[in-house]
């Protein structure tokens, strides 16, 4: 075995996916692995680099397609990817990198604000050695939240935003609103 594998961190908005991604990458850095993180370049809510909703920043390459950063990451053994659901080539990229012996850690939404699947992320599940689904806290009733709900009437899937545009909600609060 070459040691390459895929770790997938999924869940709704505000569940700590990016924070967990950063935590895992930092663990590998402490162990002297060469690490790189990649963020979706259209996500510029807080500035350059990878940002958590609580304003923690981590250095990251930016791309809209992962194949565009292949040359830049050849010397790294750990690759962290944030907002994985937005990369059209996420499945092929992760499988290739893991097969080449790299550790790939992906943080992504598993469902849209309409509770429809991000199919590219679901396609990663059978290819991943580790899958963790995080929950958030329902912003209406304060129970466990597994879903993201968009505020407003916009129906386009790729609308990048934070607490101003989305809430994490439980099943009951999703259905009731």
Swiss-Prot record:
Broad EC category: transferase
Recorded superkingdom: Viruses
EC number of this enzyme: 2.7.1.21
Statement: the UniProt record of this protein carries the keyword ATP-binding: yes
One family name in Pfam for this protein: TK
Residues at which Zn(2+) binds: 138, 141, 170, 173
SUPFAM superfamilies (UniProt xref): Glucocorticoid receptor-like (DNA-binding domain), P-loop containing nucleoside triphosphate hydrolases
GO MF annotation: an example: ATP binding
Quaternary structure (record): Homotetramer. Two molecules of substrate bind to each enzyme tetramer.
Family per similarity comment: Belongs to the thymidine kinase family.
Protein name: Thymidine kinase
């Amino acid at each position: 075995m070459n040691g390459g594998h895929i770790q997938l961190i999924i869940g709704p908005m505000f569940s700590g996916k990016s924070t967990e991604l950063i935590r895992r990458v930092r663990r590998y850095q402490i162990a002297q692995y060469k690490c790189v993180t990649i963020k979706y370049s259209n996500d510029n809510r807080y500035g350059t680099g990878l940002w958590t909703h609580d304003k923690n920043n981590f250095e990251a390459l930016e791309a809209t397609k992962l194949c565009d950063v292949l040359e830049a990451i050849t010397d790294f053994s750990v690759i962290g990817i944030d907002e994985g659901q937005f990369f059209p080539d996420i499945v092929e990229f992760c499988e290739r990198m893991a097969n080449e012996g790299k550790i790939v850690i992906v943080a992504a939404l598993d469902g849209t604000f309409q509770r429809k699947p991000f199919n590219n992320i679901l396609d990663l599940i059978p290819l991943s050695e580790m899958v963790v689904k995080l929950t958030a806290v329902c912003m209406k009733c304060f129970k466990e939240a597994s879903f993201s709900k968009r505020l407003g009437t916009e129906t386009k899937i790729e609308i990048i935003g934070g607490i101003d545009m989305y809430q994490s909600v439980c099943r009951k609060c999703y259905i009731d609103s």
